């Protein structure tokens, strides 16, 4: 199956299937156009895939080898340099085409700027958006661009999608006021717990799009990300939430975004790769 806006790149090393036969389909979005602090998100998809080469495909605590699952990797989106809206349009069109060919598949974006999650949500049309992020991303505009990475949750809210945001430790009063007006619940990293997650997500309508901005994790784990923040969550806290979510809710799509860096062995990419394997494993073992 060919796509207008994708190109071949490094792929997972274990056997892959054609997109039409896959349950999970990877798509890289190497976009870095509105990064406001540390550049390098354009290398994210490749760094995550490289990091998977260091991991065993067998997940011990699941007794599951994800190399035996029907996974496809359709490469990376050919981005429009400096234009988050046009690049997100390419993400949207690619996923719309993909869903026509295989409506039961779960697309997984690897990125890449968080701005590109908008294109995925527009294509997959979830009822709810659950995001782990250090930032609220509810600005109306940032650096004169309404499609900046700092605005993605606001643009998604304007689509009528219900939202819940976890791991926050940075935001503006404007964003907090907007969240209050739109009844968007969020949980500060200091107050995060599994019970707090379940309490807010349990009532959300399905299907759910799950987004992980890698900066939600503690900075010691993820030093290479576009807008790093101290004081984040632990790896197993997020995995526990994912396990519950995929068992209780239908998943429309999933992403791991804002992975930056420039070299093999970067701890940020290694964290993202491990999270990718656990997320796929959880969806296979516990998901519907």
Curated annotation (Swiss-Prot):
Manganese in keyword set: yes
Binding site residues for Mn(2+) 1: 114, 133, 137, 213
Alphabetized UniProt keyword annotations: Cytoplasm, Hydrolase, Manganese, Metal-binding, Polyamine biosynthesis, Spermidine biosynthesis
Pathway where this protein functions: Amine and polyamine biosynthesis; spermidine biosynthesis
Chain positions of site Important for catalytic activity: 144
UniProt-annotated binding residues for Mn(2+) 2: 133, 135, 213, 215
Thermal dependence: Optimum temperature is 90 degrees Celsius.
EC number: 3.5.3.24, 3.5.3.11
An example molecular function term from Gene Ontology annotations: metal ion binding
Top-level division of the source organism's lineage: Archaea
Disruption phenotype: Cells lacking this gene show to a decreased growth rate at 85 degrees Celsius and a severe growth defect at 93 degrees Celsius. This mutant accumulates N1-aminopropylagmatine and agmatine at 85 degrees Celsius.
Keyword Hydrolase annotated: yes
Cellular component, GO annotation: cytoplasm
Signal peptide positions (record): none
Catalyzed reactions: N(1)-(3-aminopropyl)agmatine + H2O = urea + spermidine; agmatine + H2O = urea + putrescine
CC cofactor: Mn(2+)
Subcellular location: Cytoplasm
Pfam annotation, one family: Arginase
Cofactor, free-text remark: Binds 2 manganese ions per subunit.
Listed transmembrane segments: none
Record family assignment: Belongs to the arginase family.
UniProt miscellaneous comment: In T.kodakarensis, two kinds of synthetic pathways from agmatine to spermidine are predicted. One is the pathway via putrescine (pathway I), and the other is that via N1-aminopropylagmatine (pathway II).
Protein's job: Involved in the biosynthesis of polyamines which are thought to support the growth of thermophilic microorganisms under high-temperature conditions. It seems that long-chain and branched-chain of polyamines effectively stabilize DNA and RNA, respectively. Catalyzes the decarboxylation of N1-(3-aminopropyl)agmatine to yield spermidine and urea. It can also use agmatine to yield putrescine.
UniProt name for this protein: N(1)-aminopropylagmatine ureohydrolase
Source organism of the structure: Thermococcus kodakarensis (strain ATCC BAA-918 / JCM 12380 / KOD1) (Pyrococcus kodakaraensis (strain KOD1))
């Amino acid at each position: 199956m060919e796509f207008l806006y994708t190109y071949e790149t490094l792929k997972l090393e274990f056997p892959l299937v054609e997109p039409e036969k896959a349950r999970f389909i990877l798509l890289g979005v190497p976009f870095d156009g509105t990064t406001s602090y540390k550049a390098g998100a354009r290398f994210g998809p490749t760094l995550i895939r490289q990091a998977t080469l260091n991991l065993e495909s067998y997940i011990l605590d699941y007794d599951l080898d994800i190399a035996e699952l029907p996974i496809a990797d359709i490469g990376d989106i050919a981005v429009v340099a400096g234009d988050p809206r046009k690049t997100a349009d390419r993400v949207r069109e690619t996923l719309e085409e993909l869903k026509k060919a295989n409506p039961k598949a779960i697309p997984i974006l690897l990125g890449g700027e968080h701005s590109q999650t908008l294109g995925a949500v527009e294509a997959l049309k979830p009822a709810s958006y659950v995001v782990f992020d250090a930032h609220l991303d509810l600005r109306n505009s940032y650096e004169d661009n309404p499609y900046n990475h700092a605005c993605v949750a606001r643009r998604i809210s304007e689509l009528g999608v219900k939202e819940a945001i976890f791991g926050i430790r940075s935001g503006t009063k404007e964003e907090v006021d907007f969240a209050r007006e739109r009844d968007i619940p969020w949980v500060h990293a200091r107050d995060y717990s599994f019970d707090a997650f379940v309490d807010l997500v349990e009532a959300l309508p399905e299907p759910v799009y799950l987004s992980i901005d890698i900066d939600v994790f503690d900075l010691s784990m993820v030093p290479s990300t576009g807008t790093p923040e101290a004081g984040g969550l632990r790896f197993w806290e997020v995995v526990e939430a994912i396990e519950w979510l995929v068992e209780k809710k239908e998943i429309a799509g999933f992403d791991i975004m804002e992975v930056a860096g420039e070299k093999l062995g970067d701890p940020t990419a290694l964290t993202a790769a491990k999270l990718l394997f656990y997320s796929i494993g959880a969806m296979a073992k516990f998901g519907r």
